[in-house]
A protein has these predicted regions:
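Short, Lys/Arg-enriched N-terminal segments with co-localized hydrophobic residues
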Residues: 1-10
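Active-site neighborhood of HAD-like aspartate-dependent phosphohydrolases
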Residues: 11-57
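A general structural motif
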Residues: 12-14, 81-83, 141-143
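Short, solvent-exposed loop/turn segments at secondary-structure junctions
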Residues: 23-26, 31-32, 90-94, 136-137
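Substrate-recognition element of Asp-dependent hydrolases with the DxDx(T/V) motif
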Residues: 64, 69-102, 106
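Acidic, glycine-rich loop-and-strand cores that form catalytic or ligand-binding grooves
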Residues: 101-114, 119
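Conserved Lys-Pro-Asp/Glu-containing loop-to-beta segment of HAD-superfamily phosphomonoesterases
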Residues: 118-149
Length: 149
């Protein structure tokens, strides 16, 4: 079998790889547990309590990373030869503020993982699944890779 085949089927290389932030490279649920002073995020009674507490705050810029985040980002950079972007869902009703603080977090993590000049495009959408092919707006049939939790 050729290099670009698997099980006799031709493998199609993704056009672009999109990496989600919350729950993939940022410890969103650990941040929630800390914010609510509980041992596990499932101890928080309602989703509305979460939204009410973090709306209008810098919550997203204060999230921690996973022990594997930096190694994972380096792997993505190497595997895609730099052809990847961030896709993240902004907090409903607080889109502008949450995106601002997600950008701050990403700037800090990218600066730490790579260098201060390193940057990646960031897209904010509540329909991340649409980005699994093309740009989420047009369709050429070329698949993308969406890494999400």
């Amino acid at each position: 079998m050729g290099r670009n085949t698997r099980g006799g089927r031709k493998m199609i290389k993704p056009n672009i790889t999109y990496v989600d932030m919350d729950g993939v490279i940022a410890d969103f649920f650990g941040g929630l547990a800390k914010e609510f002073n509980v041992n596990h995020w499932k101890e928080i009674p309602t989703q509305q309590e979460v939204i009410d507490k973090i709306t209008g705050t810098d919550f997203f810029s204060r999230l921690g990373i996973f022990p594997t985040t930096i190694r994972f980002l380096h792997m993505i950079e190497r595997y895609t030869k730099g052809h990847w972007s961030i896709i993240s869902t902004p907090l409903k009703g607080d889109e502008e503020n949450s995106a601002k603080h997600k950008n701050k977090w990403l700037d800090e993590v990218f600066g730490y993982a790579f260098d201060n000049d390193f940057n990646k495009k960031r897209f904010y959408s509540d329909k991340k699944w649409m980005w699994a092919t093309d740009t989420g707006e047009i369709s050429s049939g070329i698949p993308n890779l969406l890494i999400d939790d």
